[in-house]
Amino acid sequence: MERRVWFLSRSARSLAAMFSCTYSRATHRHSGKTVVRSSGTRCTRQPRLCRVTRSTLVATSPRRRSLVQQRRPPLREQNGGSGSSCVSSGGSASTVKTPGSRRASK
């Protein structure tokens, strides 16, 4: 019984590794520049996966101005729940774009 459990856990680990590889490839295809880097080195997969997930989260934001809001912590604190609600609701471009332009004009 113990050997079977160990074999199952090992196969599960290999499946998880395969899934992580395919996931990283799929995300790297979206961000074109990192494809060459990821194919070159295979050793540092885990930190790059973290970076890839961060970049995909940023990429899901509708406009680049929301990217600037995420980089600056005081603006994020001023937003409070409004910014997070926009992202969670799917972030229509108009709702995210108008507060950014108002801040830029100020």
Swiss-Prot record:
Pfam families: DUF5473. InterPro entries: DUF5473. Residues 84-94 have a biased composition (Low complexity). Keywords: Early protein. Residues 54-106 are annotated as: Disordered. This is Uncharacterized 11.6 kDa early protein. It comes from Human adenovirus C serotype 2.
